[in-house]
Amino acid sequence: MPESLMNIRVDRKAFAGNTVLQDIDLSLQSGEIVSLLGPSGCGKSTLLRIVAGLEQDFRGSVDNIEGEVAFVFQEPRLMPWLTVEQNIGFSDDAGYDRRWVGQLIEEVGLSGFADALPKALSGGMAQRVAIARGLYSHPTVLLLDEPFSAVDAFTRMKLQDLLLQLAERHAITLLLVTHDVDEALYLSDRVLVMGSRPGTITQQLPVGLQAPRDRRDPLLARLKAQALTELHQAHII
């Protein structure tokens, strides 16, 4: 059994008196990839913000965090006046490590773009910068909020494969929010299905695909059918 890295419990999270999350009990294991799958408004992004420490007003706890936690948002949120290199090292008040930034630029496939401004980048390239920025602090856990929803299908597949490579290379744990059943199954070791009103985890689906993953694997089709059945049973679709 992998080492438990983080325990997340949300008894209740409310906005303006309305309960948006309830009875969440989740543990993350070292090195695993977990997806939160569910409809809009079920509290997936709110749960991610709680794990990141961006939401403090809730009843519950986030325990046993070891090391840094980094966040990759749905939009890259790059500083338009900073270069790719500067955007990646932006959070380092002491002055960023140019060698480390250069390595990350190479790892995310942007060699030759260190001095480029965001306006010169495609959407997929900008999101590669955002992922590199998330990795800059050597996080133990990387949180991703629908990171590939704004790119085309072919770019999305390339970015998914890149994410798997980076997770393995850096031995990090990923917690990912997505609306895409195929993406959740392809990337994850576990898929957690969330229902809404209030948001809670209704189903847990172990994936069990071996690396390297193959989109043509018949197991993916069987898992998708199972996931869709569970989404129907939870009245999510």
UniProtKB/Swiss-Prot annotation:
Matches recorded under CDD domains: ABC_NrtD_SsuB_transporters
Catalytic reactions on record: ATP + H2O + aliphatic sulfonate-[sulfonate-binding protein]Side 1 = ADP + phosphate + aliphatic sulfonateSide 2 + [sulfonate-binding protein]Side 1
One Gene Ontology CC term in the entry: plasma membrane
Membrane topology: Peripheral membrane protein
EC number: 7.6.2.14
Entry GO MF terms: ATP binding; ATP hydrolysis activity
Domain ABC transporter: 5-221
Keywords assigned by UniProt, alphabetized: ATP-binding, Cell inner membrane, Cell membrane, Membrane, Nucleotide-binding, Translocase, Transport
Residues holding ATP: G38, P39, S40, G41, C42, G43, K44, S45
SMART domains: AAA (SM00382)
Family: Belongs to the ABC transporter superfamily. Aliphatic sulfonates importer (TC 3.A.1.17.2) family.
Subunit architecture: The complex is composed of two ATP-binding proteins (SsuB), two transmembrane proteins (SsuC) and a solute-binding protein (SsuA).
Protein task: Part of the ABC transporter complex SsuABC involved in aliphatic sulfonates import. Responsible for energy coupling to the transport system.
The name this protein goes by in its record: Aliphatic sulfonates import ATP-binding protein SsuB 1
Biological classification of the source: Bacteria, Pseudomonadati, Pseudomonadota, Gammaproteobacteria, Pseudomonadales
